[in-house]
Amino acid sequence: MYFTNITGGEPFIRTDLNDIVRELYKKSDRIVISTNGFFTDRIIALAKEFPQIGIRISIEGLEQTNNEIRGLNDGFNRGYTTLKKLREMGMTDVGFGMTVQDKNAPDLVPLYQLSNKMGMEFATASLHNSFYFVEAKNIIHDRPMVAKNFEALINELLKSNSPKKWFRAYFNHGLINYIYGQPRLLPCDMSFDTFFIDPYGDVMPCNGTKDKEVMGNLNVQSWDELWHSEQAEAVRNKVRHCTRNCWMIGSVSPAMHKYIAKPALWVLKHKAKSLLGLKYSMYENPICCDYRDGKVSKADLDKLSTCDMNAMVNNGLSANSNAALQGKRGEDIVNADVESQGYEATKRDSSSKLGY
């Protein structure tokens, strides 16, 4: 495999993560771990053993915004401090990951500028609904405002001297297209050349489907048996007809490499315009013009999203697990685990301030 992303939940809650990474490096050329950055000492220890590893710390805006969204006491400080320590160690494949929504869109460019100042990567996403996120009601309410902030980020990326950032500008252009509920700019080939494995051995095309679509299970099948099974082919057929139009880096990055002509032409055109002092506009997306001009309504766009206010999401937990959750928040269970490992439990409020 050329790339593996380890995500969660929070991967560093697992005390055997180093063992998992060690095994994965026997099969994968590159590994990136997505984390909230809370377990600084564990992250540093893993980075010392695997200095080539990538670390993306989820930070949902500047300090106040991040801590409000994530509900982690001192969450921004912990993530920021972890990133600084990783850079001081000489690690290069580290950076921020931000999921953009109404609450944090105004922080998008300031957070990018902070990451740029620190010489770090900056990854973006927007709200999605799926079985994996145990969510069906995520939706962008003020699309023009959020799109305007993506527009500003795109122009910042195009001004850089980094071709990698120019292609990230294209990815963010696709996020504007996504939040307006439009068809993907590039085909989705999940389950054909990319896949998702959960902690229980179930192999799925991705983590963006409405319901859990299982191709097979590695605890009872060999990889070749699973990959070429009738069940896997049935799931691929669903992917061929999927209308969710997700735009997440896990599916888009392989597509950008596979169908390079379209993003490359976009990049060449818009970098040339940037050099001439001309800026990218969100209104290059026809749907943005249609909404501005009253040709489509907010209700029309809401219908195009994957948001379903009446949906009952199956969280995939067993009856025993659901019983254990009665009367508790997920955070309460995580806090109990965190405290059992000698860490301070998180709180919902934060009075800390960070100068940067």
Write out the residue ranges for each language-model feature.
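Conserved SAM/AdoMet-binding glycine-rich loop
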Residues: 1-61
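Short Fe-S-cluster ligation motifs
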Residues: 1-7, 237-245, 273-296
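Residue-level detector of family-conserved "landmark" positions at structurally sensitive sites
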Residues: 6, 34, 96-97, 125, ...
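Radical SAM enzyme [4Fe-4S]-AdoMet core and its adjacent flexible, acidic
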Residues: 23, 27-29, 49, 53-60, ...
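A short local structural element in Rossmann-fold oxidoreductases
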Residues: 44, 67, 247
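Short conserved micro-motifs at the rims of enzyme active sites and ligand-binding pockets
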Residues: 207, 255-260
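Membrane-interface junctions of multi-pass transporters
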Residues: 209-253
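Short cysteine/histidine-rich metal-coordination sites, predominantly Zn2+-binding motifs
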Residues: 259-269
